[in-house]
Amino acid sequence: PEKQIYTCFSCGASGNVFTFVADFEKISFTEAVRLLGEKVGINIGTNISVSNKKDEYFDIYSTANKFYQNSLFTNLGKNAIEYLDKRHIDKDTIKKFGIGLSIQKVSLTEYLINKKYSIDKLVDVGLTNENGHDIFINRIMFPIYDLSGNPVAFSGRIYNTKDTAKYVNTKETDKFKKGKILYNYHIAKEYLKKNDSVIIMEGQMDVIRASTVGIDNCIATMGTALTREHKSIIRNMANNVVLCFDGDAAGEKATISAIELLEDTGVNIKIVRLPDNLDPDEYILKNGKDSFLAQINNASNLIDYKMEILKKNKDFGNIKDISSYVNSALKELINEKDNIIVELNLKKLSDNFNIDYETIKDKYNKLIKNKKEVVRDIKPKKTYNKYGMAENYLIYYMLKNEKVLNMVDGNEKRVIGVL
């Protein structure tokens, strides 16, 4: 207790209060600092700078969220409820995900102004336009939460017309950046404490649909490609990642991009390829829970998926295409660490294309040798010990913050306490 650290003698994990919360809650170190700050009444920004002023942003979005939810269950919300019912979204699911409704006849802007929020602030946070009117009108509202479970944005979907954009999202703000948000993270992380596998999808309706059949370890990228910020979050969430994007060409492109980003994280990646260009929402509606779970349980491992992708646009009646495919496959296999998987795939290449096994193995060994020689030529990166890193961080904050610079007066403990 005196040292403010912990050690688990069972699994060997150790660290301080921040690393403990990060590991337990499956969140990044930065989010752990911010979460603990909120617990003790300190507002920690995304750059870990401390502010004593209460941020109105979360209050506004929390108030707006309740307003939209209440609007859905009024007489003016009957058509929206019927629409959701036809989409097999029941009231329990509506409440679980905080789904609401924006209504033209009932102004959110006026409601929030009566709550003493300024019009400038409402424009700034993306709920009101420059003319003082609501951004969202006659749309089913899906709140978007940050990693700590605070509502920070909305996605509004049309339900009674086809003459406008299907979805409208809150503009990006300091608190809402798509590249840092994973839809349903705040709910999914609770299920991941028991299930060490997260399913990544593209859209919020995919996640909601999965939840309606009891599959709650799903998150979504809000329709964007995975980012480096997402990568850091996902790495801490689970040891097993299932990519289940849409079954069309765009979904396949997103899958390949996600693999390239996550491949060096050490997580076990599996891939689901849904048939008939269906997305998870459509697939579950059409085929049901058991069929979808079968897709998840039979997901391809990383090397099998890559081998299938390499076959695209290849004519295996053409010798050059066969040679091109085999060489590309071998280049993928040299990165595989499991020798059994390597041997099985080498044998499969030999059998499928009637090529002598020793010829395949010889080519593989040459590629391995060349790879080792290239690695040998690369100079090792300069590394820093913990004291060097601490010094670098101190210099960084001295340059960034004049208050820190002024505090460097020989009292190192005081400075470290601030950082």
Where are these regions (language model features)?
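Non-catalytic accessory segments of DNA primases and related replication-initiation nucleases
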Residues: 1-120, 124
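Structured, non-catalytic alpha/beta "coupling" segments that mediate domain-domain communication
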Residues: 23-32, 37, 139-158, 281-286, ...
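Phosphate-handling DNA/RNA-contact segment within nucleic-acid enzymes
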Residues: 103-237, 241, 254-255
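Acidic, metal-coordinating catalytic cores used for nucleic-acid/nucleotide bond scission
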Residues: 205, 226, 245-255, 273, ...
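C-terminal or mid-to-C-terminal helical accessory/interaction module adjacent to the motor/catalytic core
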Residues: 267-355
